[in-house]
Structures are given as C-alpha cells and as structure tokens.
C-alpha cells in the first residue's frame, strides 16, 4: 500500500510539472480585474500578458481616464480601476502602482493546474492512509481477538506514520518550490512582454526586473535599483488614436511601395533641390563636435592650422575652427596643387624705352587664358570682368563700340540668370504645394533632416512614422536624424 501511494504521488507531481511547462505564458486575472477587462471587450478568463495590457489600455481609452492636456496622467478616482489600484491617479512615466496591482491580481494558469494536480495526489494519499469501509467491517469480525488486531494495527501504523512524515516534508518542499516557480514565471512573463514593445499607456520595466539592456536605444537609464524605472517621453505619440486602422495599414503598404518606386527618381530630385554631399562628409560633420573638440585626444598625427594654430584630426582637410584648407593637402597630386596655387597673371612691366610710342591701328590676338578650376573661374567671372578677356579679337580703333556690345551682352546674361532663378523657385514652390508622396492626402509639412541637408517630401505623420520604424529618407535614402513640422504661411 505504501509503494502504491508513493507511485501515485510521483505520477501526480510529474503531471503537474508537465502542465506547468506547457502553460507558462497564460495568466488568470482575479474577479475585480476580470470585470475591468470584460468592460474593455475581453472574452474568457485566461489571457496572455500582452492581452491584459491591451485591454487595460482600451479601458483607459474608452473611459477617457487620461488627461487631454497632459496625456501621461491617468485619473482613476471613483472608478473600478482606482478601487483596484488603491490610488486616485498615477503617471504613465511611473507605472509602479499598476505593476504592483498586476502582481497581486494575476495568477498564472500553470500554477492553478499544478495546485489541482497536487490536491488530487494528496487526496489519494489521504484515502490510502485511512481505513476504508471494507477494512472496518473486516476489523469488526476479528474483534474477538484483540491482541491480533492490536499487533496488526501497530504493524500498519508504524510505516504509515513514517510515510506521512516523509510525504509532509515532500509536500512542503513542493509547495515552496511551486511558489518560487510561480513568482519567477510571472516575472518572466512581465519581462518578455516588456521587451516585446510597449503601447503608449505603459512605459518602463518592472521595478524588480530593472536590468540594463544594451539595445542601442536612446533612452536615458539611471541607477537600476528597485525604485527605478526606464522612462521615455512619448506624450506626443497619441496621433495614431485619431486614425483608422485602414488608414494606418494603407500608409504602411504605401511606404514599402514608394521606397521601391522612388529609387529611380533619386538622381532627378537630388539634382534639383540639394547638392550631393558624400557620405564621408556627413559622417565627419556629425562626429566633428565629439572628435575635434576633445583636448585629451592629442596624438603625433594631428596637424596644426597655420591660421588659428588649432590642432585638428589627421582625417580632416579643413580646420574645424577657421575652415582653412590644410597646408600641403595631397601634395603628391601635381594637378590639384597647381589649380589651388595658381595666382593671377602678373602684368609684364613695360620698358622705359617704349614710353611715348603710339599704339598701332591694327588688330592683334590675345593669348589663351590659363585653365583654372571651374568653380573658382565662375566666381571670379563677374567681379573681375575684363572686356579684353571676353572678346577674341578687338578692334583697338573702335573701342567705344566694343564696350557697348559688351554691356549689352552683360545685361542679357543677367536677365537670363534671373529668369532661370525664378523658374527654379516656382518649380520648388509647386513641389511644396503637392500632397505627401506617401499617403497622398495631407500636405507636405514634415521636414526630414539628415546631416546638414533636409527634404520636404512627406507629411509630418508619415515622416514621424518613417523615423520610428527606422526607415531611410524616401528622397536620398540617408538615415533620418530628426523630423520637424513646417508651417507654411
């Protein structure tokens, strides 16, 4: 009988362990919390952690318990949620009262099944330890021999009492083990839900699960003690509450389609609106404040500016302070140094013997100008305009007529440049008036900033959605650093 009881208890404990391993992720809320979940549209009595958090958020939204101005504040006084929390209000930035309530009102379904299995096993042991009705009848027929009955009772009582002591110790160990497993299991469910991504109404980790994670996020983390929670400001992230589900799905699908369609148009839009800057230049600009201004990062490879005497990183070709070009930059390239060091042609001094000689009345040719870099030549073309350099053959006898021709040509070029600038500005203005390139509904008021350039191609909602999803700029495929809203007056 003792061996049968032990085997029954082992089988019951094995089934309890098997049930607990299968149903770890399910929780069962208590009655008061279950009423709140049912009021928010939940069905059933067993949920996952994500479902519990979802319906709690739906309850807060339906009842409009949050403040319209400061939407991270939830006022639950006089409501079922306030009675359950035991407070009048709480902030989303410090959700510790909410987590304490969930710990008290959530029970893992696995622990319920294991308790049932344990109760069944203890009941079997209890029925086996006490005599049955047949055994009592058999004892009544043998009552005539009291000594024999006493000896049999002693022989049965001794192993049974030992078995009871051993079973009671095993039961205490099992209950203690189950309580520890239940607590760790609930903590694990909270932590797994917390890492998976939070809605707007719950921020931060559990106080007992505050473990620093190096996930590359920009959230500021303080001391990870028991009273500390990871908090990020999402008070302006309620814009999606006013949008329908179909609109959100439509925008998400159009973002993927627009990324594939606009790859062929990147060259056209970038040539019209922005000057193409290399990726290395943007990286240098973003790291300039951290790399160049640190006094402790001195090395033998740094070069000193000849203008302001500042030490700069060896990878920089311009001085960070005065923006002067580094001396002997790429000195091995003869063409580049020649173009940068080319000076104006110095006039040949006339001999004193030639003074007083009349200039002949004839035509003469002027030598070809020295080839200069394209940018520098265009900049010096207007302020240093010389009639002798712009005309191939000059009639020295008719200088007044040539000057009139040159002045008329200058006026025509100025008029042409002004017309070209006006047409470009009109094209840019018409592009701004077009709707968003992703949703094609809202105006283009979301300015996508990356480095020292930005693009105004989407609305503010779509631009912020791209920033949150980690997508790149739809115009130039660069990483989005900041999104601002533009108001066109």
Curated annotation (Swiss-Prot):
Stretch list, region Disordered: 131-166
Annotated stretches, region: Region II: 246-331
PROSITE patterns: SWIB_MDM2, ZF_RANBP2_1, ZF_RANBP2_2, ZF_RING_2
Claim: Phosphoprotein is one of the keywords in the record: yes
Alphabetical GO biological process terms: atrial septum development; atrioventricular valve morphogenesis; DNA damage response, signal transduction by p53 class mediator; endocardial cushion morphogenesis; heart valve development; negative regulation of intrinsic apoptotic signaling pathway by p53 class mediator; negative regulation of protein catabolic process; negative regulation of transcription by RNA polymerase II
Molecular-function GO terms, alphabetical: zinc ion binding
Sequence motif: Nuclear localization signal, positions: 441-444
Location in or out of the cell: Nucleus
GO cellular component, one term: nucleus
Keywords carried by this UniProt record: Metal-binding, Nucleus, Phosphoprotein, Ubl conjugation, Zinc, Zinc-finger
Renumbered zinc finger spans (RING-type): 436-477
Tissue spec. comment: In all tissues tested. The short isoform is expressed in a variety of transformed cell lines.
Record PTM Phosphoserine, positions in chain: 179, 341, 367
Region described as Necessary for interaction with USP2: 392-489
Zinc finger (RanBP2-type): 299-328
Domain spans labelled SWIB/MDM2: 25-108
Record-stated family: Belongs to the MDM2/MDM4 family.
Quaternary structure annotation from Swiss-Prot or TrEMBL: Found in a trimeric complex with USP2, MDM2 and MDM4. Interacts with USP2. Interacts (phosphorylated) with YWHAG; negatively regulates MDM4 activity toward TP53. Interacts with MDM2, TP53 and TP73.
Record text about domains: Region I is sufficient for binding TP53 and inhibiting its G1 arrest and apoptosis functions. It also binds TP73. Region II contains most of a central acidic region and a putative C4-type zinc finger. The RING finger domain which coordinates two molecules of zinc mediates the heterooligomerization with MDM2.
PANTHER family: OS05G0521000 PROTEIN, PROTEIN MDM4
Identification of the protein by name: Protein Mdm4
Gene coding for it: Mdm4
């Amino acid at each position: 009988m003792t061996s049968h009881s032990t085997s029954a208890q082992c089988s019951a404990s094995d089934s309890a362990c098997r049930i607990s391993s299968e149903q770890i992720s399910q929780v069962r809320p208590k009655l008061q919390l279950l009423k709140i979940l049912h009021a928010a549209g939940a069905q059933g009595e067993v949920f996952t952690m994500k479902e519990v958090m979802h319906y709690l958020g739906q309850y807060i939204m339906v009842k409009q318990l949050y403040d319209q101005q400061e939407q991270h504040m939830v006022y639950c006084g006089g409501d079922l949620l306030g009675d359950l929390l035991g407070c009048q209000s709480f902030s989303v930035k410090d959700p510790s009262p909410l987590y304490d309530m969930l710990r008290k009102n959530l029970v893992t379904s696995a622990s319920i099944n294991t308790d049932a299995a344990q109760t069944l096993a203890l009941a079997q042991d209890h029925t086996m330890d006490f005599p049955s009705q047949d055994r009592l009848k058999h004892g009544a027929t043998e009552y005539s021999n009291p000594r024999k009955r006493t000896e049999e009772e002693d022989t049965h009582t001794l192993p049974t009492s030992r078995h009871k002591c051993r079973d009671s110790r095993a039961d205490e160990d099992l209950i203690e083990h189950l309580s520890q497993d239940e607590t760790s299991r609930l903590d694990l469910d909270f932590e797994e839900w917390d890492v998976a991504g939070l809605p707007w109404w719950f921020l931060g980790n559990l106080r007992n699960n505050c473990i620093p994670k190096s996930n590359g996020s920009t959230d500021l983390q303080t001391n990870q003690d028991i009273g500390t929670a990871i908090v990020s400001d999402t008070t302006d992230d309620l814009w999606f509450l006013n949008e329908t589900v179909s609109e959100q799905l439509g925008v998400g699908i159009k973002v993927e389609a627009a990324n594939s369609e606009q790859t062929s148009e990147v060259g056209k839009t970038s040539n019209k609106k922005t000057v193409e800057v290399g990726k290395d230049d943007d990286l240098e600009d973003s790291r300039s404040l951290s790399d160049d201004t640190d006094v402790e990062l001195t090395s033998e490879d740094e070069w000193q500016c000849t203008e302001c005497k500042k030490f700069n990183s060896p990878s920089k070709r311009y001085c960070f302070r005065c923006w002067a070009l580094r001396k002997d930059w790429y000195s091995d390239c003869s063409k580049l140094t020649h173009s940068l060091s080319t000076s104006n042609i110095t006039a040949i001094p006339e001999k004193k013997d030639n003074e007083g000689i009349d200039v002949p009345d004839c035509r003469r040719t002027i030598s070809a100008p020295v080839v200069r870099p394209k940018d520098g030549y265009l900049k010096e073309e207007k302020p240093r305009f010389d009639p002798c350099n712009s005309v191939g053959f000059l009639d020295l006898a008719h200088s007044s007529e040539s000057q009139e021709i040159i002045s008329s040509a200058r006026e025509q070029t100025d008029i042409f440049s002004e017309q070209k600038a006006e047409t470009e500005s009109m094209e840019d203005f018409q592009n701004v008036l077009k709707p968003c390139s992703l949703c094609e509904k809202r105006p283009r008021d979301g300015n996508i900033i990356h480095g020292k350039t930005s693009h105004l191609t989407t609305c503010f909602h779509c631009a912020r959605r791209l920033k949150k999803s980690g997508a790149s700029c739809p115009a130039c495929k660069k990483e989005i650093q900041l999104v601002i809203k533009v108001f066109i007056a």
